[in-house]
Amino acid sequence: MRSLLSIILILVASAALIAAVPAGSSITPPPPIEPVQLLSSQPSDSKRPWIRLRDWIIESIWGIPKSRSPGFPSKDAAGRAPPSQVLARYGSDVVLRFQLRDQQEAEALAQATDILFLDVWASTSEFVDIRLAQEVIPSLLGLLPDSLRTAYTPLIDNLSEMIYTSYPTRRPVGLENQPGFSSSIRQSQQFGDLFFRDYQPLSVIVHWMRLMSSMFSSHVRLINVGVSYEGREIPALRLGTSGPNTQDTPRKTVLMVGGSHAREWISTSTVTYVAYQLIAKYGKSRAVTRLLEEFDWVFVPTLNPDGYVYTWESDRLWRKNRQPTSLRFCPGIDLDRAWSFEWDGERTRTNPCSENYAGDEPFEGLESAQLAQWALNETQHHNAEIVAFLDLHSYSQQILYPFSFSCSTMPPTLESLEEVAMGLAKTIRQTTQEVYDVTSACEGIVTAQEQKASKRFFPVGGSSGGSALDWFYHQLHTIYSYQIKLRDRGSYGFLLPSEHIVPTGKEMYNVALRLGQFLVGESAQDIDWSADLMDAPGTSDDGRETDVDLNRDGAGEEGVDSELDAVDEEWELIDWEDEHTYELRK
């Protein structure tokens, strides 16, 4: 009873601390947005005392109102545009999927989208998804060859309705069928499940991050990796059991980033989900405990806080940051095209109205520059080594490896990149049955595996130079750098329903666990890593585990280190200095 009372007092104190955000804080919460209705809609007379106390604690932490009436809110009540404004912005918009057969078709489609300033949602080796108003379809088809005028299918024909319903509703998501306080493990899981039942606005995410660092201070710290153009901090959670590294050996760090593109809400939710699973399982799971002892894990839920807030307040499909450009009516820079390495790639983007506008010079996108400076500071002044970089995006279910700027330049560690990526994709397939394709990140590459030949397609949707993926791989020599495009394959696109938050989070948690297992090596062979996979199958009839093992040829910790040393020699084979003048060097 005494321990239970102590836990309650700690939670109450945490609520008070979290609510007391300094007035001068650089984190600027957005106007009040309809929060997730968690608990208060339950009749008070049906609650047990402990449930009411728990509800009050969570409501105090997250600022959840005490009562709501069913139905959609008005603009004044919820800070969200009513349906009339949604219809005014997106009323006739649809999403079309084009199937490409050859390079000429790809070039024609790319040129047409440039001329009409269309929003390319996805461009893969199999399809290209384009958002446009219905009245623009004849103009687009008029610019295309005859073979493409019938090579498309409607993917989303009710875009405005899907956009409106993508925001959290006023439907309560309480604990109707859940008992009162049970074991601490189960209670922790229930607490996490509440947060991930819907997408959350930035203000709630920041409060949640503060809560995590307060409740789990032994292995969680809230840090900032920079400040956005509008003055918001870019918060991150650093997980690990070590303090400042004073040893000669660099502290190995895994970095996971989401929300570079504001409309990709699932990437932000997934970063927080993976972080929460590692936080909650530390000390309970041998595998997770080992990962937090061996590495620092840094999670940045949204690199683009200004754009993310804007998607909640004004434009659900906003992609770029909110930085002014040379055209007053076309603000925003694509933060995944603003990095210095091979900036703007093979095609120059000079139109600020483009969704892929990379700025007028490298690192003009402020948030990208801030993250780059933080990473350089960590490696140069804090004795850290970023050994893995996971850049989460949506959609199309792909695991992409460098380089993105060109399909003709091969990364010096191509074999390792492909092998690990295939193992991660296999882990996803064997646990959640979802298929993630593995390929190079350079846009528009199509591989004919049956003919053992490949052909380059003209990139549809803009240049792929200046990416974070290439910068971390080249500049910091982060060998295991991946851009992962999450669910789905186009049925919902960027408007993925909240029911997919937890399943997608489980997939990336499994990816993080398997990647961590690979990085640790055979020194942790006594740990049953498979036991911690989420939604994992059991064992085969003969008792063998059915999931993938990423330990290649028994490579242990020393094997990984020796591989890193060997890679340093491979980097020297490429003369980057003469050809890539934008690079800042150690």
Curated annotation (Swiss-Prot):
Residues that, per the record, bind Zn(2+): 261, 264, 393
Single biological process term from Gene Ontology: proteolysis
Main location as per UniProt: other
A GO cellular component entry from the record: vacuole
Cofactor, how bound (note): Binds 1 zinc ion per subunit.
Binding, substrate: 261-264, 319, 336-337, 394-395
Region described as Disordered: 535-562
SMART domains: Zn_pept
Alphabetical keyword list: Cell wall biogenesis/degradation, Disulfide bond, Glycoprotein, Metal-binding, Secreted, Signal, Vacuole, Zinc
Protein name per UniProt: Inactive metallocarboxypeptidase ecm14
Organism: Aspergillus terreus (strain NIH 2624 / FGSC A1156)
